[in-house]
Structure formats: structure tokens, C-alpha cells
Regions:
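C-terminal motif of bacterial Sec signal peptides marking the signal peptidase cleavage site
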Residues: 14-15
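Sec-dependent signal peptide recognition
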Residues: 1-9
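Accessory carbohydrate-recognition regions in carbohydrate-active enzymes
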Residues: 20-202
Length: 202
């Protein structure tokens, strides 16, 4: 009887102890695997089965950049809300947003000549990629971009330097690779606090 009582007491004490700390499995994830070579992997913020994959889109429009990102490149033409990953064919890049400082241009620009368009080099040494979050400094503008996502929404936060010439450009025309806009438009709400828009493409 004493042995049964001791075992019962030990079981009760064991049940009263703190549960083991939850393991953070996302710390083992490297979202940049497959972004070099011919991997065509998207880098940015998304959630499983989400409708948006918000992340950077680079200026090159060739096969290895069909996800919008390649490890060998540090250009950013904007942050698009839809990307394909690992497909080997380019599409989407819908609703691209680019924070800028200074004179606004709507030209895409030429590779190796940032002054020809609105794009910037990204500081890849300070880039942060983890599940559900992406951040990178834009060298040309001194802006830090941060992105995260829900199932249906891409969320952006931009930290600008002190300036009277800060702006955010919404690019409805430029897609990626073989994607071409066929119908685009936007409108402001009556109180100018919201923007609604659309982009249809091939």
C-alpha cells in the first residue's frame, strides 16, 4: 500500500510541473534555399496556402529570375504581392509597390543604371528572411522595407530617412518576365484614406 501511495504522489508531482517549452521549428527554416542556380524560389513573406506572396521583384526579366528574386542579384524594382515559386516560368508580380525618396519616375529603368528608373540596389548583407517576414534596406533611397503577410493581405512598413520628398509608387503596369498588363486602374476613397485598384494580365 505504501508503494502505491508513493507512486501516486510521484505521478501527481509530475503532473504539476511546468510543461516543456514549445520548440520554435521555424528557426530551422532557411527561406533562401533554392534562390540561386535554377531554383526559381520566391523570397518574401507568406503563410501556408495564402493568397499573397509579398516580396521583392528584381529588374532582370530572364528565366532564372522568374520568381522575382535571384541570389546573384541585388536589384529591387518594387515589392510585389504575388509570386510563383519553383515553377520555372514567370508570371504574376501583381501590384508592385516601391518606396522612394526624391524625384519620382515611373520608368522601369535599365539594368546596371539605377538612375534610368525607380529601382534600387538592396543591401543583401542586412537582408532578413524568415518564415512570414522579410526586410531589406534600399541603398539608393536610404529606406528600410519590411514585409509580412496574412492569408489574404501583404503588409508593408517602410522606414524613410528625414525628407520632404518621400513617396510610395504603385506600379500596375510592370509585371515579371512574360506577364503583361491588359487592364489596370485604381481609385481613392472619398476621404482619400484608402486606395482600391485592380490589375488584369496575360
Amino acid at each position: 500500500m505504501k508503494l502505491t501511495g508513493l507512486l501516486f504522489a510521484a505521478a501527481l508531482l509530475g503532473a504539476c510541473t511546468q510543461p516543456a517549452a514549445e520548440e520554435n521549428y521555424t528557426r530551422h527554416v532557411d527561406p533562401k534555399i533554392g534562390t540561386g542556380g535554377h531554383g526559381h524560389v520566391f523570397v518574401g513573406a507568406n503563410v501556408p496556402f495564402g493568397l499573397v506572396q509579398v516580396g521583392p521583384t528584381s529588374i532582370p526579366q530572364t528565366w532564372d529570375w522568374c520568381s522575382g528574386y535571384h541570389a546573384s542579384d541585388s536589384t529591387v524594382i518594387g515589392f510585389s504581392h504575388t509570386h510563383l515559386s519553383g515553377t520555372g516560368i514567370g508570371d504574376l508580380f501583381d501590384i508592385t509597390v516601391m518606396p522612394v525618396v526624391g524625384e519620382v519616375t515611373y520608368a522601369r529603368g535599365e539594368e546596371n543604371d539605377p538612375a534610368s528608373g525607380l529601382w534600387s540596389y538592396a543591401d543583401r548583407t542586412r537582408e532578413i528572411t524568415k518564415p512570414g517576414y522579410y526586410s531589406v534596406p534600399l541603398v539608393r533611397y536610404g529606406i528600410t522595407a519590411e514585409l509580412t503577410a496574412t492569408e489574404r493581405v501583404g503588409l508593408h512598413r517602410y522606414t524613410f530617412p528625414a525628407s520632404d520628398a518621400a513617396a510610395v509608387v504603385f506600379d500596375l503596369e510592370n509585371g515579371g518576365c512574360w506577364d503583361k498588363a491588359t487592364d489596370t486602374g485604381f481609385r481613392f476613397s472619398d476621404d482619400s484614406t484608402r486606395i482600391a485598384g485592380w490589375r488584369c494580365s496575360t
